[in-house]
Curated annotation (Swiss-Prot):
Residues 49-62 are mitochondrial matrix. Binds a dinuclear copper A center per subunit. Its EC number is 7.1.1.9. This is Cytochrome c oxidase subunit 2. It catalyses: 4 Fe(II)-[cytochrome c] + O2 + 8 H(+)(in) = 4 Fe(III)-[cytochrome c] + 2 H2O + 4 H(+)(out). It comes from Aedes aegypti.
């Protein structure tokens, strides 16, 4: 999700997103090296006067251009597989948050507590505070404790949605009749914005997500106030 004057990825706010950023840079470096090498070879072939009229086949070069791409692909595949398994791993979560997608808003349930649930709608532009974020702010934010493992259970009631917060490295489909899960750890306090990333109808663009990360002692106070 692009932000103002942002030409790259958003700043990482979770260990998983830091790993995804590293993998992005790692893969991009390999692609740049391949592009430069191919461009150099093509340039040298076009602008030299060497010819070999009797070359029918070159077994050595054929072996090289078969084995070398396989080795390069392994350098991309192994870190990618490691990340895929990291994203599926659930590490003793402290909090479980259930997310339900609707046309066109989100519902949240804190599974560890009784009767703690709410709907989250986008605040219309004409009702927005002066310092609010247009098309991104919501009436009820998700409040989560920082530096703790959080499990997210995601589903939908009508059509396909996708719960996505880029700076946390989270993108998980909300599918009717299916419960998907993932986990993350927020390593700093702040507000983190996301949006539905699956086209789900006329108001697909108006399903923002706001996660507010706070220290544990403030989270306990917030839970107490909600329960009372």
């Amino acid at each position: 999700m692009a932000t103002w004057a942002n030409l790259g990825l958003q700043n990482s706010s979770s260990p998983l997103m830091e790993q995804l950023n590293f993998f992005h840079d790692h893969t991009l470096l390999i692609l740049i090296m391949i592009t430069v090498m191919i461009a150099y070879i093509m340039f040298m072939l076009f602008f030299n006067k060497f010819t070999n009229r009797y070359l029918l086949h070159g077994q050595t070069i054929e072996i090289i251009w078969t084995i070398l791409p396989a080795i390069i692909l392994m350098f991309i595949a192994f870190p990618s597989l490691r990340l895929l398994y990291l994203m599926d791993e659930i590490n003793s979560p402290l909090i479980t948050l259930k997310v339900i997608g609707h046309q066109w808003y989100w519902s949240y349930e804190y599974s560890n507590f009784l009767n703690l649930e709410f709907d989250s709608y986008m605040i219309p532009t004409n009702e927005l505070d002066l310092n609010g974020f247009r098309l991104l702010d919501v009436d009820n934010r998700i409040i989560l404790p920082m530096n703790n493992q959080i499990r997210i259970l995601v589903t939908a009631t009508d059509v396909l949605h996708s719960w996505t917060v880029p700076s946390l490295g989270v993108k998980i489909d909300a599918t009717p009749g299916r419960l998907n899960q993932t986990n993350f750890l927020i390593n700093q306090p702040g507000l983190f914005f996301g949006q539905c990333s699956e086209i789900c109808g006329a108001n697909h663009s108006f399903m923002p997500i706001v996660v507010e990360s706070i220290p544990m002692n403030y989270f306990i106070k917030w839970i107490s106030s909600q329960m009372n």
